[in-house]
Structures are given as structure tokens and as C-alpha cells.
Amino acid sequence: MPEIDARLREDVHQLGELLGDTIREQYGPAFLDKIERIRKGAKAARRGSAEGAQQLTATLDGLEESELLPVARAFNQFLNLANIAEQYHRIRRRRPNEPEPFENLALEELLGRLKDAGHAPGQLARQLAGLEIELVLTAHPTEVARRTLIQKYDAITAQLATKDHADLLPEERSRIQRRLQRLVAEVWHTDEIRKVRPTPVDEAKWGFAVIEHSLWEALPNVLRHVDEVLLRSTGERLPLSAAPLRFASWMGGDRDGNPNVTAGVTREVLLLARWMAADLYLRDIDRLAAELSMQEASPALLARVGDSAEPYRALLKQLRERLRLTRSWTHQALAGEVPAAEGVLEHNRDLVEPLQLCHESLHACGMGVIADGALLDCLRRAATFGLFLVRLDVRQDAGRHAAALSEITEYLELGSYAEWDEKTRLEFLLEELNSRRPLLPAHYQPSAETAEVLATCRAIAAAPPASLGSYVISMAGQPSDVLAVQLLLKESGVDWPMRVVPLFETLDDLDNAGPCMERLLTLPGYRSRLSGVQEVMIGYSDSAKDAGTLTAAWAQYRAQEKLVEICRHHEVELLLFHGRGGTVGRGGGPAHAAILSQPPGSVAGRFRVTEQGEMIRFKFGLPDIAEQNLNLYLAAVLEATLMPPPAPEPAWRAQMDRLAKDALHAYRRVVRDDPQFVEYFRLATPEQELGRLPLGSRPAKRREGGVESLRAIPWIFAWTQTRLMLPAWLGWETALLNAIERGEGALLGQMRERWPFFTTRIDMLEMVLAKADADIARLYDERLVPLELRPLGRRLRDLLSQAVRVVLGLTGQSLLLAHASETRESISVRNSYLDPLHLLQAELLARSRRCRGDACGGLEQALLVTVAGIAAGLRNTG
């Protein structure tokens, strides 16, 4: 087994030592010895030592009540420090003989393959410049780490980078060491659990901070890399106006199931984004004004600024004044309705035009090397982020729109919209959409719920169109769901064609997505209300919770194929929006592989996807890592567009139909049909306690009820904590075994080798099974589950073992992840720190369920720390 890189080991060891020193300083050497005994016992137990297992449990059992929290914190913080070291290792300085990372080479290598396949250089340059990739940042409540700590973690990363030079003087090394010691101590003495739930505005500010501290720097670097690669490969440059990557957000716009996101919140977040954008551009302009001290300028520039000794500075000064005015106005508008003063920047062209004039002038005067420095970076940012930083999506449940329209139709004595069939609804909606008179009389007084729906639509009408993305309708199922929103927007004064996007997210809705869109596109007048593309969102989380990951994945694939076919037939351009989570159970996984496994024709130069919770930090939290991931997105979308995977063969389709049918039956037999399942789930996992964790602004439950009432995130998060990982694999074990017993093993092998969709699914399944651990899950059962429910736990663990056996048989390996030994080694190293947290968590859950009143405070804090630690150790929470 190849060892983890020695430099990574050294960083992890050093940070661990510094944490140990900090703990010894506060609690003394005897306490640190206990932590070491726990760690060594866990490590030995993992190697099969009964003595080690005994040492682990004896030391944990012997802990005083007052020691539970610091022990949990110690293992939690070690895992966070290991994550920092691992993340830095991905971007550390390369030694002279080391190859460049795959992410940096992917685009150039792809352009070479595309040219070899017959694509003309000019066509490749146009295609790459015209890509439309939009990453939608969402605040799903899986970002366990606090913002305060994230900033300290980033400072530790910076020190690791400073240390990574062979030519440091001894005093420089000791200065770095002291700074690291201070930072680790700051981390240790900072409470890692938020005391209060973040508001939607807090979440939006967190998203803006990722842009400010990482993406603002990463984006121009990525486009500079694209420009250089294009020039080498095709002889052409990336146009200044090209924005192949853009960013949108749901933070402050996603009100589905979140009563805290109101129309007022949406307005506030839109203004905050404008304030942040103006502030970031002002920093850029200050730097440019210092740099561009040249005198020689083009006639066009001189005509704008008159007789000036420093024409570039004169023009930038005008832009700076307008940016200051814009920032000042947004600040005032946050306190109350204030009309925009003259000079406030309203259109992106007002920002871009003076910058472009400077760029053209410098090139015309033989100063291209200056033009293509910081000024070009600022132009790239202006094309990508614009004046509004991100485009804000709005999302609401279809039921809320239907309820609002019902109230309106009843008030107008037209009957109850909710009780009408689809045909009647469509007739009413089409008539109202085409009518010139308003639907609502001026004196109409709606209920609070309807007033909020209408206020949201009015907030959209009041916002600049360029600041908004799409209006997403969750739980959409019928054409009327889309027209209902179009009517409410029209009624509220939205006079531009906002994209209204149905989100198909249950198994039935995915199966019905094609017929629904077919009907919609043939409705009279619908096409004329379309703004360019038809966007459709595919939900990964809820469909997987509804049907299991295998059946859901096949339904998502078929729905996309059908939508591609229908839009092609109607000559409408399709944009698919992928609502993926961070975990496999919610459609997560490496983006590069996921994009290349989409159905042929479904990408076509456009790709929109959610980036969620903790995955935003792991993928985009540091500029260098953000660059790697953005490079991968560009290469994958270009490849999926110009070299799409083959269409599945009929035999593969038939096999997927059989697998999906068997998997659905097996999944629902457990999750829906077993009368003990919901009670077992609530007792064997920390599901109830997760609701008390102040993670995101959204409640964890939709309403009272069984599994279907749970949001997809706590559903996954709870099973991850106990290492059963049930949602990610349940159904696969039965479907694959049935196929093998029918003699279809060779066909499965062929699908795995030749069909990217199936390959990616099996790879993701293998990764999840490598992180799952039946022994840990059993410990939770023994501590928390009454005797009468334990047979169900045993059965689920048997199914997990069956899944492992079947996957090993299919991949021809004796060990999971045998082909990815570094990943296996990383999981194995983490287990020594995770195992004590799991044991502690099971014990704390048992105690907290017995205790009442004030005595629970300390237990609860320790319990929440174990939740955060396990999430950090497994690197994908929900």
C-alpha cells in the first residue's frame, strides 16, 4: 500500500503535536495521556487487537463527566487540523521533479484530443468562450464549522505554505512555528459550536465571504490559464467579454420550507450583494489607479478625460466616484427605501466600458504588457460577477402558489383553484396571462401566507433583472405550476421574462417530467414568454430519499434524455439545473466524473448545478483549490459537449430497468413497509438531536410524520454519523445480487467498463461502502436501541455486508478502493480519531435521552461537538 506522502504526514503530525501542547497547557499532562491512550487503543483495535479495544473502552468509560467535552473537542479539532493539512497538500509547492496536478493539465490535454478528433481550432476557441457554467451556492445546513474558525483554519493554511520552502533561515522557521502554535491555541480556545442558528442573511454573508476571500482571486487566474491554453492550442485568445463561469446563490432566496426567508430578507440580501460588489471593485480600482500612472493614451480616452497629465487615473477617478456613490446608496437603502441617486451604477456596461477603454488605449500605445495585468483581471471579474456579485434565485413550493391562487379565486367568487382539475387551471391561467386588466382589485386584503407570496413577487419586480437568476418551483408536477408563477409575477409588475423553473424531485415527478414539459411547450403563448432557454431542475436529494439512489439515478437519467428529445423536437434550447448535494445519497460526488456521465446531448455547452454547504468550503474556500475545481468544471463541460458519452445500448437499458425495479422494491420494503423502521431510525441515530444543532436557518422537518416528512439533509446526516450510510447504498445490494444470480455478471462488467453513467455510480457506491462501518453502527444499536428493534439493525448490517461483497465481486478486487490506496489510507488514518468520537457520541446520546432539565447542558454541548467532529472526519455531512 503506498503510504500517504511524507510531507502530508509531517504536517498532520506537527499540527497534532501543537494541539497536544495546547491541551497539556490547559488540562495538564495526565489528561493528555488519557487522550493518547484513547487514540492508541482505537488504532490497535482497528488492527484487530482485543487489548487495544479493551484499553479504548476502559479509558472512555473511566472519564469524568467534566472530561467528556474536552475529550470530544480534542478529537474533533484533530480531524479539522488533518483536513487543513490534506487540503493544503493538494496545492502545495511542487518539487522540481514532481508532475503538475491533473486539474491544471486537464483543459490543454482535452483540447489536444479534440483537435485530434477533427475539431477545428477556431471552433474550439468559440465553443470554450461560449460555455455557460453557473455554480449556484446554497446554504444547506451542513456547514458545521463556524465562520470564525474557518478564518483561523485559513490562516493555518497560509503558515503551512510559508513553511514549505527549503531555503528558510532558522529564525524564519521558528517564527512560523510560533505563529502556528498561536493559531492552534486560538482554535482550541474558540467554541466550535454556534450558540444561535444563523439567519438567512448570515448565510448569505458567509457565501459573499467565500467570493471575497477566494473566488475573487481565483476566477481571473482561471481565465488567464484558459487564455494561455487557448493561445497555445488554437492560436486564439479568450474574448474580454467571455464569462464561461458564473455564480448564483440561493442564500436569501430559497424560501421552500424556510419561513425565515421573507420578501424583506430577499431585498436585504440583494442590496448586500451590491454593496459587497461595489466594495470589491473599489479595492481593485484603488490598486489600478496606483499602477496606471502613464501619460500616453489613445484619442478616444483623451476625448473622455480632456487635458490630463494622467489620463488613466482621471478616468478611473470618475469610476471610483460612481462606485463610492453606489456603495453609499446601498448602505442607506438597507436602512429603508431610498431611491437611487444620480450616478449610482445600474448597468454592467457602466462598469465595464471605462475599464475597456483603458485596456484598448494601453494596447494601442504599445503598453499591452501593462494592459494584460491587474486591469485585465478586473475586466474578467466585471464580466463574471457584474455589479450584483451573484444572481439570486428564488425558490418556493408549488403548493404555496396554488394556495395563494385559491384564496384569490375564492375572493373573486370564481371557485377554488385548489379543487380545479389541470384543464380548468390551465384555461384560467392562460386567460389571465393574456388579459390586460389586473387580476387583483386594489383593496384586496390577502392572508399573511398569500401576502408573503405576493410580496416576494413584488421584491422581484423592484430588483434589477440582472441581479436575479431563476424562480425555482419545488415539488412541481404539472404545467399549471409554471403558469401559476408566471401569473403571480405578471400581477406583481414583473415586466421582463424571468426564467420560471419546474423542479422535478420525486420518482413519480421525474417519470412525468417529459410529458409535463411537452404539454407546457405546446400551450398557446408559452413560447413567447420564454426568455431564450427552457430551464428545468432535476432534484437528486428528494428522489433518492423517495426511491433509493439506484432507482433515482436511473429516473434522473431517463428524465434528462426525454427532456433533451422534447426540446430538440420543439427547437427550444434546454438548460438542465442539477440539484446535487454534498453526499452520494444526495447526488454528490466528483463533479468531473458526474458531468461526463450525463446523457449525451444533455450538457450542450450549458451546465447549472448547486454547490452546497461544506462542499463550498472544501472546493472553493481557498483560491488555489477553487482554481483546480473551476478548471475541472471547464474541461468536463467542454468534453461532455463536444465528446459526449455514447448512448446506452438496449441491453444496458433493459438491465438498468431491472436493477431499478429490484432496488426500489428492496429500498421501500425497508424504509416504507417495515413498521419498526421509523422508530429504529429515530433511536439508533442522532436524528432527533440534529434538529437541535444550530446549523442552518431552515427547520429540519417539513411537518410531523415518517421519513417522508424529513428533509433530505438530516436524513443523510443522521445515517452518516452512525457510519451505516444507509441511504447511499440501500437497494443496490439486492439489485446487483439478483442480476448476478440471473447470470448477468458479464453484462454488468461490460456496463462498468463502457458506460460512464454506470461506472460513476459504482465508483461512488464503492467510496461510500469504504466509509461505512457495520461494527460502529452495531455499537450505536447496543447502546441506544431496545432489544425488540435490534433484529432490524442486524438485518440492515447484513445488507451492508452483502453490498460490499457484491461490489467487490463486480470490481474484481479483494479490498474496497484497492485502486485508490491513498484514499483508503486516508480513511484508515482518520478512523483512529473517529472511533473514539463514535463511542463517545453513542454514550452521550444514551445519557442525554435519560436526562432532564439543566443537567443536560454540558451533555448537549459535548454531543454537538461529536457531531461536528464526525462530519469533519468523513468530509461529507449532508
From Swiss-Prot:
Forms oxaloacetate, a four-carbon dicarboxylic acid source for the tricarboxylic acid cycle. PANTHER family: PHOSPHOENOLPYRUVATE CARBOXYLASE. The keyword Lyase applies. It catalyses: oxaloacetate + phosphate = phosphoenolpyruvate + hydrogencarbonate. Pfam families: PEPcase. One of its GO terms (molecular function) is magnesium ion binding. The lineage of its organism: Bacteria, Pseudomonadati, Pseudomonadota, Gammaproteobacteria, Pseudomonadales. GO terms for biological process: carbon fixation; oxaloacetate metabolic process; tricarboxylic acid cycle. SUPFAM superfamilies: Phosphoenolpyruvate/pyruvate domain. The active site is at H140, K545. Keywords: Carbon dioxide fixation, Lyase, Magnesium. NCBIfam families: PRK00009.1 (NF000584). It comes from the Bacteria. This is Phosphoenolpyruvate carboxylase. Belongs to the PEPCase type 1 family. One of its GO terms (cellular component) is cytosol. Its cofactor is Mg(2+). InterPro entries: PEP_COase (IPR021135), PEP_COase_bac/pln-type (IPR022805), PEP_COase_Lys_AS (IPR018129), PEPCASE_His_AS (IPR033129), Pyrv/PenolPyrv_kinase-like_dom (IPR015813). Its EC number is 4.1.1.31. HAMAP family: PEPcase_type1.
